[in-house]
Structures are given as structure tokens and as C-alpha cells.
């Protein structure tokens, strides 16, 4: 009187394509190339309401927690296009899982794992990591992404603040399936910018053999960026002795030599005036008028130097106001 045992294989798989476990990497690479060719066909790009994009040769999944704006969430867009499958919070994923709680970096050593079981990401807000129940999103192969720079409009230029599609693309590039990254990034106008922005780093990571070498490549890159720190310069500091130029305005190339010539000329003129004053002082060295003239001749260079300094400062202030 027990329940009738259902024959194996009679259940329908809901939206899942079961791949043979013994598929070789060469066969997988051929499927990747076919998927790329199908994705670049003009008919697929123009007909958004057609049969949908070509199926990817590996499974893509995500745990969606509802932290992000649905209109900006790249993971939800991929799910609407049928490229990514949404998982329940407590559902297990057997492939590679990109998670902040991972202990190893993604590396080319994960190539076979990705080809056989796919990749999953966690769609959560970077501002709510402490409130995200990572322990409920179960997986056997948790991985971290190395240092990369985001190209999405929300976090452009920020290191490690990648969106879902950028995380998928980074993992595919590192394990050696860059065509899959191109297929996903083509769905976004800014997608190509992610590959251009991180080309050097992605090539370094893809040339590694394991997670340890990926870590060394990351540390080497970060060390090289710290070796050349940017100099902190205040362009409004008039006492710094530096000359600054407004790049939005043309600057005459003869301006600096003219100023130098004028300065030299003024110095020569001051020296001539000092000699003339000395000659005038010689006829009456002991008179009261001679003493006053002598003291005035000593103070004149200092007064002229102070006048030049105040004039230069005033020019700098006027130039800053004009700019």
C-alpha cells in the first residue's frame, strides 16, 4: 500500500539542461564558440521578443536577496533573458560559487569545475554584507575574486565593487572561457568597458596555475601601484613656488621668457640707480643730507624686493580669481 515508486528519469527538469558528466574541455570549448556565434547574430540583437538568446554550455545561477534596484540589477536582467537561474535561499549549488566568505581565489585550476557544473553568484548589496545570510547559501566550492575594478555605472572605478555580470565575466576570463564573458557583457552598453579596464589584471590572473599564484599576482600589482604614490599638491598655495596653468585656456609660450626679461631688466635698472645714487653721495659725505641719502640708498633694494614679492602675490591672486 506504499507510494508508487517513480521511475528514474521520468521527472521533468524545470528549465535545467543536464550536461553529460564526462564532457571534455574540447567539447565544451566548441559549445562556447557556437554560443558566441549565436549571440552576435544580427537577428538575435534586433528581435528581443524572439525565442531568446542561445543557451549557454554551462549553468549560471544566483541567490537573489532583493537588496538592489530591479532596474539596475544586472543579475535580474540576465535572469529575464533566460541566462541565469534564480536559486532559493537554502538551495545548494554544486558548481563554483563566488562568495565573500570564500577562502580561495578563482584560478585556472577551476576550469574543469566551471565546465561541468557552472558558476553561481550572490546578488546582494555591498552595503548590507553584515545582514546577508551567507551560511544559508550552500555550496561546496566557494571562491573569491581577486582585485578588479568595477565598470558598472553605479560603482565605476571602485575596486572590488563588481556587479553580478562583472563577477560572472571575471570568473570566466580567469578560468579561460573569455568568450562566455563576452556573451554576457554584450547585454550591457558598458560591458566592454569592464574588459578594457581590467585587461592587464585579467591576463595576469589567467596565466596563473592555482589560487596561490593568483594571490601573488594580485599582491605584486598592488605593490607596484603603491611604489609610485601621487604627490599631494595644493594648486591654490601661492607660497609653494610652483606655477599652475588652467588647462581649459591656452597659454602663450613666450609669456615666461618675457617675464624673466622684465625681471632682469628691472634688476639692471635698480643696479644702475644704486650706482647713480652712490655717485651723488660722494660730494657731501658729512652733511645731514648726505647721511639721509646714504640710508635711503641702503633701504631701496629691500623696498623694491618687497614690492616685487607683493606684486607677484597679487598677480597670483588675480590669476586664481580669473581661472
Swiss-Prot record:
UniProt keyword annotations, A-Z: Cytoplasm, Phosphoprotein, Ribosome biogenesis, rRNA processing, S-adenosyl-L-methionine, Transferase
Coiled-coil residue spans: none
Q: Where does S-adenosyl-L-methionine bind?
A: 74, 122, 145
Its localization reads: Cytoplasm
Compositional bias, Acidic residues, is annotated for 259-282
The record's Pfam families line, in alphabetical order, gives: Fer4_RLI (PF04068), Ribo_biogen_C (PF04034)
Q: Which GO terms describe its molecular function?
A: 18S rRNA aminocarboxypropyltransferase activity; S-adenosyl-L-methionine binding
Q: What class of enzyme is it?
A: transferase
The alphabetized list of GO BP terms reads:
enzyme-directed rRNA pseudouridine synthesis
Does the keyword Nucleotidyltransferase feature in the UniProt annotation? Answer: no
Give me the ranges of the annotated region Disordered.
1-25, 247-323
* PTM-bearing positions, type Phosphoserine: 24
GO CC entries: cytoplasm
Q: Which Enzyme Commission number(s) are listed? A: 2.5.1.157
Give the reactions, separated by semicolons, that this protein catalyses. Answer: an N(1)-methylpseudouridine in rRNA + S-adenosyl-L-methionine = N(1)-methyl-N(3)-[(3S)-3-amino-3-carboxypropyl]pseudouridine in rRNA + S-methyl-5'-thioadenosine + H(+); N(1)-methylpseudouridine(1248) in human 18S rRNA + S-adenosyl-L-methionine = N(1)-methyl-N(3)-[(3S)-3-amino-3-carboxypropyl]pseudouridine(1248) in human 18S rRNA + S-methyl-5'-thioadenosine + H(+)
Under the heading HAMAP family, the entry gives: TSR3
Give the family this protein belongs to, as stated in its UniProt record: Belongs to the TDD superfamily. TSR3 family.
- Known role: Aminocarboxypropyltransferase that catalyzes the aminocarboxypropyl transfer on pseudouridine at position 1248 (Psi1248) in 18S rRNA. It constitutes the last step in biosynthesis of the hypermodified N1-methyl-N3-(3-amino-3-carboxypropyl) pseudouridine (m1acp3-Psi) conserved in eukaryotic 18S rRNA.
Q: Specify the protein name.
A: 18S rRNA aminocarboxypropyltransferase
**Could you tell me which species this protein originates from?**
Mus musculus (Mouse)
Q: What is the lineage of its organism?
A: Eukaryota, Metazoa, Chordata, Craniata, Vertebrata
Amino acid at each position: 500500500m506504499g507510494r508508487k515508486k517513480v521511475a528514474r528519469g521520468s521527472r521533468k527538469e524545470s528549465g535545467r539542461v543536464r550536461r553529460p558528466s564526462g564532457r571534455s574541455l574540447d567539447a565544451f570549448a566548441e559549445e562556447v564558440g557556437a554560443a558566441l556565434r549565436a549571440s552576435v547574430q544580427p537577428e538575435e540583437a534586433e528581435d528581443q521578443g524572439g525565442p531568446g538568446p542561445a543557451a549557454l554550455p554551462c549553468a549560471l545561477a544566483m541567490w537573489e536577496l532583493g537588496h538592489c534596484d530591479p532596474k539596475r540589477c544586472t543579475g535580474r536582467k540576465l535572469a529575464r533573458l533566460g541566462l541565469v537561474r534564480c536559486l532559493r535561499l537554502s538551495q545548494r549549488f554544486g558548481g563554483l560559487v563566488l562568495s565573500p566568505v570564500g577562502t580561495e581565489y578563482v584560478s585556472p585550476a577551476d576550469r574543469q569545475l566551471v565546465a561541468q557544473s557552472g558558476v553561481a553568484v550572490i546578488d546582494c548589496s555591498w552595503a548590507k554584507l553584515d545582514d546577508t545570510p551567507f551560511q544559508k547559501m550552500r555550496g561546496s566550492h566557494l571562491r573569491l575574486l581577486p582585485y578588479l575594478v568595477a565598470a558598472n555605472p553605479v560603482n565605476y572605478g571602485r575596486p572590488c565593487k563588481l556587479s553580478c555580470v562583472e563577477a560572472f565575466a571575471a570568473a570566466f576570463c580567469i578560468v579561460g572561457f573569455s568568450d562566455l564573458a563576452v556573451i554576457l557583457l554584450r547585454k550591457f552598453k558598458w560591458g566592454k568597458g569592464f574588459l578594457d579596464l581590467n585587461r592587464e589584471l585579467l591576463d595576469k590572473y589567467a596565466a596563473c596555475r592555482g589560487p596561490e599564484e593568483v594571490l601573488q599576482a594580485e599582491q605584486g600589482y598592488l605593490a607596484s601601484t603603491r611604489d609610485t604614490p601621487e604627490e599631494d599638491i595644493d594648486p591654490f598655495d601661492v607660497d609653494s613656488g610652483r606655477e599652475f596653468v588652467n588647462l581649459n585656456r591656452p597659454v602663450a609660450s613666450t609669456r615666461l621668457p618675457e617675464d624673466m626679461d622684465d625681471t632682469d631688466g628691472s634688476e639692471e635698472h635698480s643696479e644702475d640707480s644704486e650706482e647713480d645714487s652712490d655717485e651723488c653721495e660722494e660730494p657731501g659725505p658729512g652733511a645731514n643730507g648726505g647721511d639721509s641719502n646714504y640710508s635711503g640708498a641702503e633701504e631701496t633694494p629691500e623696498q623694491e624686493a618687497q614690492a616685487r614679492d607683493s606684486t607677484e602675490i597679487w598677480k597670483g591672486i588675480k590669476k586664481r580669481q580669473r581661472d
